[in-house]
Amino acid sequence: IKIRGTSTFSAEGVTPLYIVDGVPLESIDGINTNDITSMEILKDAASAAIYGSRSANGVIIITTKSGQEGKARIDIKYNHSWGTLSHKVPQANRKERLLYDQYRKEYFETYGGGNPDESSDILNDPLNSFFNVDNDYLDMITSTAQKDQVDISVGGGTKKLKYFINTGYYNEKGIISNTGFQRLNTRINSDYSPTDWMNMGSRISLTYSKKKGLNEGTLLSAVLTRRPYFNTYYPDGSLVGVFNGQKNPIAQVNYTTDFTDSYKANFFQFFEIKFNKYLKFRANINANFYLDKRKKLEPSLITDEWQKQNKGYSYNYLNWNWMNEDILTYARKIKDHNFTAMVGVSAQQWRYENETFVGINSSTDFIYTMNAFAANLDLSSTGSTLSNHSMASIFARVTYDYKGRYLLNAIMRRDGSSRFAKENKWGNFPSVSVGWRFSDEKFMKFSKKFLEDGKIRASFGITGNEAIGNYDYIYSYSPNSIYDGVGGVIPTRIGKDNLKWEETKQFNLGLDLNFWNSRLTITADYYDKYTDGLLANYQLPKESGFAYMKTNVGEMSNRGFEIAVTGDIIRTKDWKWNASFNISRNVNRIEKLSEGKAYMEGDIWWMQEGGRVGDFYGFKSAGVFAYDESNAFTDKWEQLTPVFENGVFQYKYLLDGKEYAGNIRQKTLPNGKPFRGGDYNWEEPEGTRDGVIDDNDRMVIGNAMPDVTGGLNTTVTWKNLSLYLGFYYSLGGQIYNAAEHNRNMFKYTGTTPSPEVIHNMWLHPGDQAIYPRPYNDDYNNA
């Protein structure tokens, strides 16, 4: 979930802050949707700033159900749903794979370079039943997902005591065979008012879930690349594991053991005391516990074709935290003036524990607990970590309005985080907003027949982000290093004690219109966000011995608009038809980087001044050379057209249809080897055009962020029966498909390309192909 673009480079800090019943949570995965009564999204800094440092990417406020005064009400709900693949990845069938094998064989026989597969004749033998099948692996490992959910709730109460209890069970059978998810959760909400001046309440949530999964990346790779004519079973009926270097997806699905048991518990208690009709005090206390226990076993059948050693994993992750928040509120109304002042303090602490055990080659494939691997632990991968993180805050808010017509809201929050050194531990996050309900002005009386409410809003605020490692500001060392069988301590991270808060300044201008007794409502917003002190990994020279260090690397902006329209098309006693539409656009720009230096984030993301977050970085093709002679360019790198007659090159070139007599240049690899027919014609960016294709010729080839997003929803209601339809759209934005890239790069003989590539690849001189020759050769066609 992203709100108003991306305001940080940090992967941990891109998500919004979740507030559930007043409690900030890192995740809402364990919440039963049937427990939710309302959800509110805070987008602008003025409304989000009260939540401080973690609200730079917006705040989602969730309120769960509470009991109502009256007799106990019991509700039972059951829901069953189905799920299918929304898009099936095209896979080559047996005929297409044999065609590809033939193409490669003919290519090597014609151009040399080695045998593509010395056993190709055996593998393609139509009389050998083991290789005479036509598998659609995706169909073989997938089916219709089945989802069941049951909820039983009871709620009610008296004037003093109200309660709500819900127990839910969710069971999902995954689309991929032998995968699934189960969840059992209970929520107990209660509110108690023993006197007129005291209120208290509790929110208790308990969740247990069990996930049965697989290594989706490895499985997808096997599905897309394994030859379709390889049988999945041997003639004796036993299951094939790894054959010809390729894993059998059926064996992976049926023999891999991967269970994750998750335990979550959240306990929230509040106390509220009213000193008089103006002044009240509230204390919030929360404790949260989260435990993950994962057991995984890769049997010897699918781990290695020759050594056949199984591999076991055990992961234990514990996260618990507590929070205390104390708030004093004063509210007063004097004639037409409404005034509220609030001041509070907050403290929160987290503790993280992680244990990892990896074992190799146990005596059985049926015991996945680590005692089976006790004699063969992989010490380089086995270990444990312990870390802590704490925050302290003080905050205040003042609100004022005159007749509800002129509105003012001011907030100041000061947060301290243990993730920064003493000098930069504290961050200040102020905000202010004003509003004008112009529909209440005398000069707007003429609009009362159609305009019920009209308001203009403006706000400015600063929010922060501290989503980095718990100890990134200090040097770290590891005692787990082993070299030549001898243990030792090595430095693992360079500290930076001048790390500071990432700050996002946001200006927002909004308009709210309500027509004909809420028959039509329109909300429009324009925002401008500017982030300073971006926290990211800064690449270091190799001579330092470290890959990177955490630092404040630059600045970034996000600008855009949001429009939402909701209307009741039909509103009668029995019939109601409501429709809503929203659209938003965000423009992101990296304004500044340290020393103006661009750098790679991961394998594909390119960060540069003037660029955008989500830019893909790679080589861009201008097509495929039809002939060896097509690799011909002018001194200005304009491509020339070779002249052929009856298939024979005439040693002539054309430029814009006219014979060219100037100097001829070629594109080459760094070693001087020229590109040939069937190779990609790689483009070169302005300023690097020298004809030598190397890493300097990579450029931005796309972006993952959409240009426009939005939704369309409609609900038709007749008495107590309703029909809801919802649509979400995203325009622009691209996806980097690593699996598609890997299977279509021709690097490995056994890899099966997509059908589109097989039917549109270059095979003979003169082919006007989309894809290159069926042989990988460095930059030529990778």
Language-model features, listed with the residues they occupy:
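Extracellular/periplasmic, surface-exposed regions of secreted and cell-surface proteins
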Residues: 15-17, 148, 183, 189-208, ...
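Phosphoinositide-dependent membrane-docking surfaces
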Residues: 33-42
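Outer-membrane beta-barrel transmembrane strand signature
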Residues: 122-155, 160-166, 237-274, 376-397, ...
